[in-house]
Amino acid sequence: MTRLQAGHATVTLRRGRGSDLDALVALEREIFDSARFAGHLISRPSFRRLLASPSATVIVAAHGGQLSAYMLMLYRSNSKFARMYSIGVAPHARRRGVARTLLGAAEKDAVSRGRSGMRLEVRADDRGAIAFYETSGYRRSGHHPGYYRDRVDALRFEKALAKAPERRS
């Protein structure tokens, strides 16, 4: 669990759990329920499976007992990369460092699982997200024409992750 100061509020980061299911589904709809993201919402059954899956990590940000953001990481057993599948921050919690803190927590989780890098895809028309990842040390590593359901291209980004220093006794 991590606490972070976001303006005048304290936000707590923790692993998602089954009891977060309703809040995660509501948050997903609040953030992504628009024509731009049509068909890309994570469903209730998918969230339920992901919360219980050993090959996924859901990290949530809570303020005042309510979820305000989440990040979903996926892990393949035969890959040295973790995949950031989704990140969502409620409108009222944006521009307070929550996304950057979630990203840092996800990177630590990836390293703890033995991964040496993280990958993600982002809509080519999402300039804010592209700038966020670039300023977080991610570099563009690929281009996927017509990747999204509305035929918008995706840009792939990746970042090498440093292993935590080994402790000497």
Task: Describe every region a protein language model picked out.
Residues 166-169:
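Intrinsically disordered, low-complexity acidic/proline-/asparagine-rich linker or regulatory tail/stalk regions
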Residues 89, 123-124:
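Short amphipathic helical patch at the helix-1/turn junction of helix-turn-helix
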Residues 103, 125-129, 146-151:
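Short glycine/proline-centered loop/turn elements that form peptide/ligand docking sites
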Residues 97:
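Conserved G/P- and acidic residue-centered "switch" motifs that form tight phosphate/ATP-binding loops
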Residues 121, 134, 139-156:
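Conserved catalytic-core motifs of GNAT/GCN5-like acyltransferases
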Residues 84, 118-122:
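Conserved hydrophobic beta-strand within the GNAT/NAT acetyltransferase core sheet
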Residues 2-8, 15-94, 103-105, 109, ...:
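Acetyl-CoA-dependent GNAT
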